Amino acid sequence: MTMFNKIVKEFQWGQHKVRLETGEIARQASGAVIVDVEDTVVLATVVGARTAKPGQDFFPLTVDYLEKTYAAGKIPGGFFRREGRPSEGETLISRLIDRPLRPLFPEGFYNEVQVVIHVLSLNPEIPADIPALIGASAALAVSGLPFNGPVGAARVAYINNEYVLNPTRPQMKESALDLIVAGTERAVLMVESEAQQLSEEVMLGGVVFGHEQMQIAIDAIHDLVREGGKPEWDWQPAAKNEPLIARVTELAQADLLAAYQLRDKQARSAKLKEIYAATSAKLEEDAAAGGTVAADKATVGNVLFDIEAKIVRTQILNGEPRIDGRDTRTVRPIEIRTGVLPRTHGSALFTRGETQALVVATLGTKGDEQNIDALEGEYRERFMLHYNMPPFATGETGRVGSPKRREIGHGRLAKRALAACLPSADEFGYSIRVVSEITESNGSSSMASVCGGCLALMDAGVPMKAHVAGIAMGLILEGNKFAVLTDILGDEDHLGDMDFKVAGTEQGVTALQMDIKIQGITREIMQVALAQAKEGRLHILGKMTSAVSGANTVLSDYAPRMITIKINPEKIRDVIGKGGSVIRALTEETGTTIDISDDGVVTIASTSSEGMAEAKKRIENITLEVEVGQVYEGTVLKLLDFGAIVNILPGKDGLLHISEIANERIKDINDYLKDGQQVKVKVIQTDEKGRVRLSAKALLNDAANGAPQGEPTPQQ
């Protein structure tokens, strides 16, 4: 007899066997599920508060994805030898899980919900993000919380013109597409992808393929809930306060309509604040006059927001101008300036309407690459992109400091968009960091970062394969009527049913991100939306190409120059020296940065061409191979009874036997040589142990016979 009511469901999913378990671990959580995909094991837990906090006016959902180093058989680094703050990868996966779950909680549900996913075991070939998303969905489904799921998820690759479900890491290296799609049985809710300039048709096909394949996982979660699910919560949304809605509509609708005729964001925002304050004040007067308690500001704010949404959505669906006066297909005015900052390696100021990004590109050496100690193994990242949005960008005050989750997510999206068009390390040996400083924001700042990032890279002299532009799109759906909005504003993002961002070149898409709030978006609607996004992207690409036709052919004076030479890998230790003494002296004395790879490729970088040339010369001298028959200018290091030790190259000495000094017999070597004397010698023999025999006599004989002696190689 066991104390556990353990429920297990197993299913074959593509090339992987998946196991779902509940009822044994974390039984005090509202819901807990273990997902095992070929030895990648995650524990997903959900805890929901039974009541909402008083005055709560938003849904407080938090998702934390945590990787434990023991999962990969490792001990954490650092002084304390324990996991610290979440890595960038953990933050991104937390966001990935949050995005499809959040829209499935019912409107008005304000109870605090926390989803925590622990990675307990990791097969390096099976990424943990999809198991984590499936686990979070299953844990919510078995918890009984009001949740309109379950959600399924799948990763889709595109290899040899075929879609592949949940590929392994080795397969991903061959794929032209890395696409994650999540959704319910009926609809896609979230897409996150990176692609090698693929067509819109291929991208949409990947979304549809992933949605079809995730149904297997959704069915398994339903089976798990039937046997191991907890009773559903008896939660009902609060009844709508119809008298309050009618009164707020009467007080504010006309003013809100007028406010949305103001095309300037700051003026419109100021007017809306006035309306909110005036409406609340009037309701308080009504309550005081009637001897009742006025509705709290949060409730009034929600009613006003619903009225705003209805006004904006109705206007757009009726074909009226959008908030800023544009039609649905027009991109805001664009201004481009490059070379903005005098001392940076590359810079661009990209302005689209009231959204502006100041983007800076910096070139570095191999030593500047980011070393990432991920759970699946260490690797180096050559290209970095960081996105910052300070509060002044929206005319507000706020905290300034370490990047928030949103900034990390936007930076990763922009990085994915540009990565496909970067030159390879063989073509362009620099490490690259792009920083996007958002100086104004009214929608689509991540896509402004893509455009500005491409321009800054070209200004820095990075030979991009093509111009890359990004555009943010919106969609409004009411019944059978829908409208796709090109280049959305911040307000349109909040009031719409879908926002998606597409980045790419003239040839195709490099990144696609979708977030869908409702379940009525069909394949046909997505097809129309992607076609309209392409039209907008090509318009922006035309503006960018007119401003900057291609990458600068000359690097900034302040960017490091770089040369590479190849040495014998066995000579690497000679260049490094004992404890790094030789390479340290080289870098300090020549003012260069020197990187040596295991295959013997030496990269020398510096802003000084003279320093680079000096470092190259010294490394070549250190790594010169002793050749039989070659003549060297050596230095006598030590005199022996039977000859002398002569240094002919750095770190390479040879024996000049007494019989090889002169043609005549020598009684006392001191009559011919002295310590420190420069002597011209010829290599006559080397052996497998690296010992070198030298001769001065051979040169005398060569001279007597008229044989060419060659130029001596001087020692460093």
From Swiss-Prot:
What is the E.C. number?
2.7.7.8
Stretches that traverse the bilayer: none
What does the UniProt keyword field contain? Cytoplasm, Magnesium, Metal-binding, Nucleotidyltransferase, RNA-binding, Transferase
State if Cytoplasm is listed as a keyword.
Answer: yes
Query: Pfam families of this UniProt entry?
Result: KH_1 (PF00013), PNPase (PF03726), RNase_PH (PF01138), RNase_PH_C (PF03725), S1 (PF00575)
> Do the record's keywords include Iron-sulfur?
no
Q: Which GO terms describe its biological process?
A: mRNA catabolic process; RNA processing
Ranges for the KH domain? Answer: 560-619
Which reaction is the catalytic activity of this chain? Answer: RNA(n+1) + phosphate = RNA(n) + a ribonucleoside 5'-diphosphate
The GO terms describing molecular function are: 3'-5'-RNA exonuclease activity; magnesium ion binding; polyribonucleotide nucleotidyltransferase activity; RNA binding
Which Gene3D superfamilies does the record match to this protein?
A: GHMP Kinase, N-terminal domain (3.30.230.70), K Homology domain, type 1 (3.30.1370.10), Nucleic acid-binding proteins (2.40.50.140)
Q: Domain of life here? A: Bacteria
Q: Which family does it belong to?
A: Belongs to the polyribonucleotide nucleotidyltransferase family.
Against HAMAP family, the record matches this protein to: PNPase (MF_01595)
> PANTHER family under this entry?
POLYRIBONUCLEOTIDE NUCLEOTIDYLTRANSFERASE (PTHR11252), POLYRIBONUCLEOTIDE NUCLEOTIDYLTRANSFERASE 1, MITOCHONDRIAL (PTHR11252:SF0)
Entry protein name: Polyribonucleotide nucleotidyltransferase
Organism, by scientific name, is: Paraburkholderia xenovorans (strain LB400)
